[in-house]
C-alpha cells in the first residue's frame, strides 16, 4: 500500500534490463529478492537468499501495510514445506470417517404389505431386541394426529357432498344410454363427458379442500397455543441447564457460494459481537465455508475474512475455508466440515448467507440441547426483515403476522417429530455424522443425483435413528431476509419445487417415520396444489360452458357463480362463504392475537388493520401469478428440464421491464384467452367470478415491476403500513448489520482477481491463502510453465473460470504473474 512511487521506479528500472519472457522462469526466491529491493532499496542479494528471511520480508511485510496488528499475532502466518508463507485460516484437521448410507426404498406393494401387516412384522423383528417404550409426548402426538385427520376428513367430506349436490349432472339415464349405444358411440361419449368432467372436478375439490382444511386446523391449534400459553410439550419451556459443559463446544457454520460478500460478513460480525456480549464466546467457533467459484468473489471473501479477524480482535475462533471440489453443494460443504473438524464439537448451528442470530438465542439453543440429551435437531423460527421493496415488505409483514400461528400449530401436531429448514437451527453432530450424511439418489434424469432440499431428508433420517426433532417456535433473536422481488422468490421456489419432487422419491423409504412421510407429501403438495387449482378452475369453466350450451334453451342462468344452476343458488353461496371463511379465519386469529397483546409494534391498531387489508389485496394479486409459475415448474420438472441454481440477490434490487415482460408474457396471454372464452361462451356476469385471477394474470408485468420498487415500499413505511416489530423497535443485531454493511460497501474489493495479481497487498494475501501446496516435482514445474505461457498468450481477461481458479489457488503462479504484469504495464 505504501511506497508506491518507489515500487513504480523499481519496475521501470528493472524493465529496461530484463525481458518479460525471462521473468516467468525466475525462481520463487529471486522474485522475492526483487520484492525486497522494492521495499528497502537494498542490493545485498546474498543476504536475502536465505529461505526464512525471504518469506518474512516479502509477503509478511506487504500484509503488514494493511493489517499490522493481525500479522504480528503469533502463528497467524506460518510456512509450508517449501517455505512459502501460509495464513492459518482454519484449525488443524481432526479427521472423522463418514460415509453415506445407501438408500433402501420399498416398492409400493412391499410398503403396503409392511403397513397392513405391521404387527406380524414387528413380532418377528423384536424377538432378539428389547421392547421400546414410547415417551409421553410420542403418545400424545399420535392421539393429536388422529384427531387432526378425523377433523380434516369430516370437514372435507361434508364440503364435497355439498358441492356434489350443487353440480348439475347427477342421475345417469341408463335407458337413454342404451338407446344412444344403438345409434352411435360418439353420442355416448358426448353424453358421458360432462359426468366424467364433473367427477374430476369433485376429486380435485376434495384434494384442495383437504389442503385448505389442514391449514385451517393448524392455524386454529396455533392460535389456541399462543392465546392460552399452555403448551406442556414446548421444548423451550422445559427446565434448562444454566451452565454449558466446558467440553461441549458449538461450531457456527455459514456455507456460502458466490454470495453478496459485504452483506454476509456484516451479518456475521453482528452475530459474533452479540455472542461476545453474552460472555459465552469461549463455547463458540465460527466457520465460513465457501463454495464460491467466481474468483472476484473468492478474493473479496478472503479480504473480508481477514478484515473481520482484524476488527474483532483476533482470538482464533473465526475460520475461513474455500473448497476446491464442490461436491453435493451445501450439504456436501457441511459434510466436509464434519469430516475434518466434527470431532472437535458437540453441536453445530447452520446459518444461511442472510441469517442473523442473537447471542442469547444461540446460547438458549445450546442450553436446550444440553437439557434434552435425546434431541437431535432444534429449529428456531427466523423472522424475515431488512428489505424495503414493496414485495419484500409485504412478504416480511405476512410471515411476521401469520408465521407464529402456523409454526405453533405445526409444533402442536408434530411435537418431537418435526422438520428443519436448513438454517438457523442447532444440530447434534455425532448422530448427524452417523445417520444423516446423504448419498445421491440412484438412477438417471433430473430426479436423481445430489439431493437439493437436503434439510427435510436430514430431519427424517435423524428421527428414523431415534433422535427427536423440535421446533422452538417462541425463541426470539433469529432473523433472515426476504427475497427483494417477486421474480427472485419464484427463482427460489423453482429450486424448492424441484427439491421437494426429488424428496418424494424417498416417501417409501424403509423405516421412515409416518410424520416425515407426510412432510414429504406436504412439501410436494405446496407446489402441486398450484396446477391442481389451475386444473380445477379450468375444468369448472369448461363444465359451466357445456352446461350453458346444453341448457341454453331451457332456462337462462342468471348467477354470479360458476358451475351453479340457478335453483341451487343458496347452497352454492353457503359453500362459497364456508371456503372463504376457512381461508380468512387464520388471518382473523392473528389480528386478535396481536391486538390483544401489543399492536404498537405494528404501527398501532388502526395502521395494523389497514396493513392487514392491504396484505389481503396484495395476496389476491400475487397468488394467481405464483399459481401459474408453480404450474410451469411442475411441468418443466416432469419434462426433464435441468435446473441451475444461482445465489439469490441479497439487496433491494428492482425488476426491469424487459425481464418482467419476458417472464410474464405467457401469463398475460393465458389471462386474455381465458377472459375471451368466458365472455364468448358464458355471460359477462360469470367473468366477475374469475376477475381477480384473470386481471392479476393480465397485468402481471406491471405487478412484478411496481412491487419491486423501493420508493413505493418506503411510501407505505412512512404511512405506518406493513410495519413489523423489527422496524419499529429494531434489535441491536439488525442495527449493527446495517451499520457494518454500509462500512463494508465503502471498502469493498472490486475486480478481486486482477487485484490479486496486480496489487502488492492483495497479491500477498492471495499468495498466503492459496491452497495448492504441492511438494517439488519436475512434472508440476513443467505444467506450471506451460500454464504461464498459456496465460501470457491468452491474457487475463480471456481466462475461463477453471483457469482463474487455478491461478488463485497456486502461490507460485500468483507471485510470478504479479511481477510479470506489473512490469509489462510499466
UniProtKB/Swiss-Prot annotation:
> Can you cite a GO biological process for this protein?
glucan biosynthetic process
Q: Name one GO cellular component term.
A: plasma membrane
- Extract the GO molecular function terms from the UniProt entry: hexosyltransferase activity
Coiled-coil annotated residue ranges, if any:
none
Transmembrane helix as a keyword?
yes
Q: Tell me where the transmembrane regions lie.
A: 137-159, 174-192, 199-221, 518-540, 547-569, 573-595, 602-624, 628-645, 665-684, 688-710
Q: Which InterPro entries match?
A: Glucans_biosynth_gluTrFase_H, Glyco_trans_2-like, Glycosyltr_2/OpgH_subfam, Nucleotide-diphossugar_trans
EC number of the protein: 2.4.1.-
Question: Signal sequence: where?
Answer: none
Q: In which pathway does it act?
A: Glycan metabolism; osmoregulated periplasmic glucan (OPG) biosynthesis
Keyword Magnesium found: no
Q: What's in the keyword line of the UniProt record? A: Cell inner membrane, Cell membrane, Glycosyltransferase, Membrane, Transferase, Transmembrane, Transmembrane helix
Location within or outside the cell? Cell inner membrane
How the protein sits in the membrane?
Answer: Multi-pass membrane protein
Function recorded in the entry: Involved in the biosynthesis of osmoregulated periplasmic glucans (OPGs).
Q: Which HAMAP family does the record match to this protein? A: MdoH_OpgH (MF_01072)
Give the family from UniProt. Answer: Belongs to the glycosyltransferase 2 family. OpgH subfamily.
> By what name is this protein known?
Glucans biosynthesis glucosyltransferase H
Natural source organism: Wigglesworthia glossinidia brevipalpis
Amino acid at each position: 500500500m505504501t511506497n508506491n512511487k518507489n515500487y513504480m521506479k523499481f519496475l521501470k528500472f528493472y524493465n529496461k534490463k530484463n525481458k518479460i519472457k525471462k521473468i516467468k522462469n525466475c525462481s520463487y526466491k529471486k522474485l522475492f529478492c526483487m520484492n525486497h529491493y522494492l521495499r528497502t532499496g537494498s542490493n545485498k542479494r546474498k543476504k536475502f537468499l536465505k529461505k526464512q528471511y525471504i518469506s518474512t520480508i516479502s509477503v509478511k511485510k506487504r500484509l503488514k501495510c494493511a493489517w499490522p496488528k493481525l500479522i504480528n499475532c503469533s502463528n497467524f502466518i506460518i510456512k509450508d514445506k517449501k517455505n512459502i508463507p501460509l495464513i492459518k485460516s482454519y484449525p488443524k484437521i481432526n479427521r472423522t470417517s463418514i460415509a453415506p448410507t445407501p438408500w433402501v426404498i420399498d416398492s409400493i406393494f412391499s410398503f403396503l404389505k409392511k403397513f397392513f401387516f405391521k404387527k406380524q412384522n414387528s413380532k418377528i423383528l423384536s424377538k432378539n431386541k428389547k421392547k421400546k417404550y414410547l415417551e409421553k409426548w410420542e403418545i400424545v402426538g399420535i392421539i393429536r394426529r388422529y384427531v387432526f385427520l378425523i377433523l380434516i376428513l369430516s370437514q372435507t367430506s361434508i364440503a364435497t357432498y355439498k358441492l356434489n349436490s350443487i353440480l348439475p349432472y347427477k342421475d345417469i339415464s341408463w335407458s337413454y344410454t342404451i338407446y344412444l349405444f344403438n345409434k352411435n358411440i360418439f353420442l355416448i361419449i358426448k353424453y358421458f363427458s360432462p359426468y366424467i368432467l364433473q367427477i374430476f372436478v369433485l376429486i380435485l375439490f376434495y384434494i384442495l379442500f383437504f389442503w385448505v382444511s389442514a391449514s385451517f386446523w393448524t392455524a386454529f391449534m396455533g392460535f389456541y397455543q399462543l392465546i392460552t400459553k399452555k403448551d406442556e410439550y414446548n421444548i423451550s419451556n422445559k427446565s434448562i441447564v444454566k451452565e454449558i459443559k466446558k467440553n461441549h463446544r458449538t461450531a457456527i457454520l455459514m456455507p456460502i457460494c458466490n454470495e453478496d460478500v459485504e452483506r454476509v460478513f456484516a451479518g456475521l460480525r453482528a452475530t459474533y459481537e452479540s455472542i461476545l456480549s453474552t460472555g459465552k464466546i469461549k463455547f463458540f467457533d465460527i466457520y465460513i465455508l465457501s463454495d464460491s467459484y467466481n474468483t472476484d468473489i473468492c478474493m473479496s471473501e478472503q479480504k473480508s475474512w481477514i478484515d473481520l479477524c482484524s476488527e474483532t480482535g483476533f482470538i482464533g475462533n473465526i475460520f475461513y475455508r474455500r473448497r476446491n471440489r464442490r461436491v453435493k453443494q451445501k450439504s456436501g460443504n457441511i459434510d466436509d466440515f464434519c469430516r475434518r473438524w466434527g470431532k472437535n464439537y458437540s453441536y453445530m448451528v447452520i446459518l444461511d448467507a442472510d441469517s442473523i442470530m442473537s447471542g442469547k438465542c444461540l446460547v438458549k439453543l445450546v442450553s436446550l440441547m444440553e437439557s434434552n440429551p435425546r434431541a437431535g435437531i432444534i429449529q428456531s423460527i427466523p423472522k424475515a426483515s431488512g428489505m424495503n421493496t414493496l414485495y419484500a415488505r409485504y412478504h416480511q409483514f405476512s410471515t411476521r403476522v401469520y408465521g407464529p400461528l402456523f409454526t405453533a400449530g405445526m409444533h402442536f401436531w408434530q411435537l418431537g417429530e418435526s422438520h428443519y429448514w436448513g438454517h438457523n437451527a442447532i444440530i447434534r453432530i455425532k448422530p448427524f455424522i452417523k445417520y444423516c450424511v446423504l448419498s445421491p439418489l440412484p438412477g438417471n434424469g433430473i430426479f436423481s443425483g445430489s439431493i437439493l432440499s437436503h434439510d427435510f431428508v436430514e430431519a427424517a433420517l435423524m428421527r428414523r435413528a431415534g433422535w427427536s426433532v423440535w421446533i422452538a417456535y417462541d425463541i426470539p433473536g433469529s432473523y433472515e431476509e426476504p427475497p427483494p422481488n417477486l421474480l427472485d422468490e419464484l427463482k427460489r421456489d423453482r429450486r424448492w419445487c424441484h427439491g421437494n419432487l426429488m424428496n418424494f422419491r424417498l416417501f417409501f423409504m424403509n423405516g421412515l417415520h409416518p410424520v416425515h412421510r407426510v412432510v414429504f407429501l406436504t412439501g410436494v403438495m405446496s407446489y402441486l396444489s398450484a396446477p391442481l387449482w389451475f386444473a380445477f378452475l379450468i375444468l369448472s369453466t369448461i363444465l359451466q360452458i357445456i352446461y350453458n350450451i346444453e341448457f341454453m334453451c331451457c332456462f337462462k342462468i342468471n348467477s354470479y357463480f360458476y358451475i351453479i344452476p340457478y335453483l341451487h343458488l343458496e347452497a352454492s353461496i353457503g359453500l362459497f362463504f364456508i371456503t372463504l371463511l376457512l381461508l380468512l379465519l387464520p388471518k382473523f386469529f392473528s389480528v386478535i392475537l396481536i391486538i390483544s397483546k401489543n399492536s404498537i409494534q405494528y404501527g398501532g391498531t388502526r395502521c395494523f388493520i389497514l396493513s392487514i387489508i392491504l396484505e389481503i389485496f396484495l395476496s389476491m394479486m400475487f397468488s394467481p401469478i405464483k399459481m401459474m409459475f408453480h404450474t410451469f415448474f411442475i411441468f418443466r420438472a416432469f419434462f426433464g428440464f435441468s435446473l441451475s441454481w444461482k445465489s439469490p440477490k441479497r439487496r433491494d434490487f428492482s425488476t426491469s421491464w424487459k425481464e418482467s415482460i419476458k417472464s410474464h408474457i405467457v401469463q398475460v396471454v393465458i389471462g386474455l384467452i381465458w377472459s375471451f372464452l368466458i365472455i364468448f361462451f358464458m355471460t359477462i356476469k360469470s367473468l366477475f367470478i374469475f376477475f381477480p385471477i384473470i386481471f392479476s394474470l393480465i397485468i402481471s408485468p406491471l405487478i412484478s415491476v411496481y412491487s419491486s420498487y423501493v420508493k413505493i415500499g418506503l411510501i407505505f413505511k412512512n404511512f405506518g403500513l406493513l410495519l413489523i416489530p423489527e422496524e419499529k423497535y429494531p434489535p441491536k443485531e439488525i442495527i449493527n448489520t446495517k451499520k457494518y454493511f454500509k462500512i463494508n460497501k465503502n471498502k469493498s474489493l472490486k475486480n478481486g482477481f486482477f487485484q490479486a495479481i496486480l496489487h502488492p497487498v492483495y497479491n500477498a494475501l492471495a499468495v498466503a491463502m492459496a491452497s495448492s501446496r504441492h511438494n517439488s516435482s519436475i512434472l508440476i514445474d513443467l505444467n506450471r510453465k506451460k500454464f504461464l505461457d498459456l496465460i501470457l498468450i491468452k491474457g487475463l481477461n480471456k481466462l475461463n473460470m477453471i483457469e482463474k481458479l487455478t491461478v488463485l489457488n497456486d502461490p507460485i503462479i500468483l507471485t510470478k504473474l504479479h511481477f510479470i504484469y506489473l512490469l509489462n504495464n510499466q
